Protein backbone atom coordinates (compact mmCIF):
# COMPACT_ATOMS: atom_id res chain seq x y z
CA UNK A 1 0.00 0.00 0.00
CA UNK A 2 1.55 3.26 -1.08
CA UNK A 3 1.92 6.13 1.37
CA UNK A 4 -0.21 8.57 -0.62
CA UNK A 5 -3.23 10.55 0.57
CA UNK A 6 -6.31 9.79 -1.53
CA UNK A 7 -7.68 13.32 -1.01
CA UNK A 8 -4.69 15.67 -1.21
CA UNK A 9 -2.21 13.46 -3.10
CA UNK A 10 0.49 14.12 -0.50
CA UNK A 11 3.33 11.59 -0.60
CA UNK A 12 6.67 11.12 1.17
CA UNK A 13 9.35 13.73 0.52
CA UNK A 14 13.09 13.48 1.12
CA UNK A 15 15.33 15.64 3.22
CA UNK A 16 18.29 15.44 5.56
CA UNK A 17 18.88 14.39 9.13
CA UNK A 18 21.25 16.89 10.70
CA UNK A 19 23.52 15.95 13.60
CA UNK A 20 25.07 18.44 16.01
CA UNK A 21 28.14 18.40 13.76
CA UNK A 22 25.82 19.33 10.84
CA UNK A 23 26.49 16.05 9.02
CA UNK A 24 23.74 15.32 6.52
CA UNK A 25 22.22 11.88 5.99
CA UNK A 26 19.20 11.28 3.79
CA UNK A 27 15.80 10.61 5.35
CA UNK A 28 12.14 10.55 4.37
CA UNK A 29 9.39 12.76 5.74
CA UNK A 30 6.21 10.66 5.73
CA UNK A 31 2.70 12.15 5.54
CA UNK A 32 0.41 11.77 8.56
CA UNK A 33 -1.70 9.01 6.98
CA UNK A 34 -4.78 7.62 8.69
CA UNK A 35 -7.30 5.03 7.54
CA UNK A 36 -10.83 6.28 8.16
CA UNK A 37 -14.34 5.07 7.33
CA UNK A 38 -16.84 7.69 6.22
CA UNK A 39 -20.59 7.17 5.97
CA UNK A 40 -21.83 8.28 2.55
CA UNK A 41 -25.52 9.07 2.97
CA UNK A 42 -26.22 9.29 -0.77
CA UNK A 43 -24.87 5.74 -1.33
CA UNK A 44 -26.06 4.32 2.02
CA UNK A 45 -22.67 2.72 2.68
CA UNK A 46 -19.31 3.27 4.33
CA UNK A 47 -16.29 4.30 2.26
CA UNK A 48 -12.82 3.53 3.60
CA UNK A 49 -10.15 6.09 2.70
CA UNK A 50 -6.43 6.35 3.40
CA UNK A 51 -5.86 10.05 3.94
CA UNK A 52 -3.87 12.62 5.87
CA UNK A 53 -5.16 14.71 8.74
CA UNK A 54 -5.31 17.62 6.26
CA UNK A 55 -7.51 15.46 4.02
CA UNK A 56 -9.92 14.90 6.92
CA UNK A 57 -10.18 18.67 7.39
CA UNK A 58 -10.93 19.08 3.68
CA UNK A 59 -13.76 16.53 4.00
CA UNK A 60 -15.11 18.43 7.01
CA UNK A 61 -15.12 21.60 4.93
CA UNK A 62 -16.35 20.38 1.51
CA UNK A 63 -18.30 17.27 2.46
CA UNK A 64 -17.65 13.62 1.64
CA UNK A 65 -19.80 13.65 -1.53
CA UNK A 66 -17.85 16.50 -3.15
CA UNK A 67 -14.52 14.89 -2.26
CA UNK A 68 -15.60 11.51 -3.67
CA UNK A 69 -16.52 13.21 -6.96
CA UNK A 70 -12.97 14.63 -7.14
CA UNK A 71 -11.37 11.27 -6.30
CA UNK A 72 -13.45 9.41 -8.89
CA UNK A 73 -12.67 12.07 -11.51
CA UNK A 74 -8.99 11.14 -11.12
CA UNK A 75 -9.91 7.53 -11.94
CA UNK A 76 -9.54 6.01 -8.46
CA UNK A 77 -11.95 3.31 -7.37
CA UNK A 78 -13.70 4.16 -4.11
Curated annotation (Swiss-Prot):
GO CC, alphabetical: cytosolic large ribosomal subunit
GO annotation, biological process: translation
InterPro entries, alphabetized: Ribosomal_bL28 (IPR026569), Ribosomal_bL28/bL31-like_sf (IPR034704), Ribosomal_bL28_bact-type (IPR001383), Ribosomal_bL28_sf (IPR037147)
A single MF term (Gene Ontology): structural constituent of ribosome
Pfam families in alphabetical order: Ribosomal_L28
Domain of life of the organism encoding this protein: Bacteria
Disordered: annotated segments: 1-20
Entry keyword set: Ribonucleoprotein, Ribosomal protein
Similarity field: Belongs to the bacterial ribosomal protein bL28 family.
PANTHER family to which the protein is assigned, alphabetical: 39S RIBOSOMAL PROTEIN L28, MITOCHONDRIAL, LARGE RIBOSOMAL SUBUNIT PROTEIN BL28M
Name of the protein this chain belongs to: Large ribosomal subunit protein bL28
Organism (species): Vibrio atlanticus (strain LGP32) (Vibrio splendidus (strain Mel32))
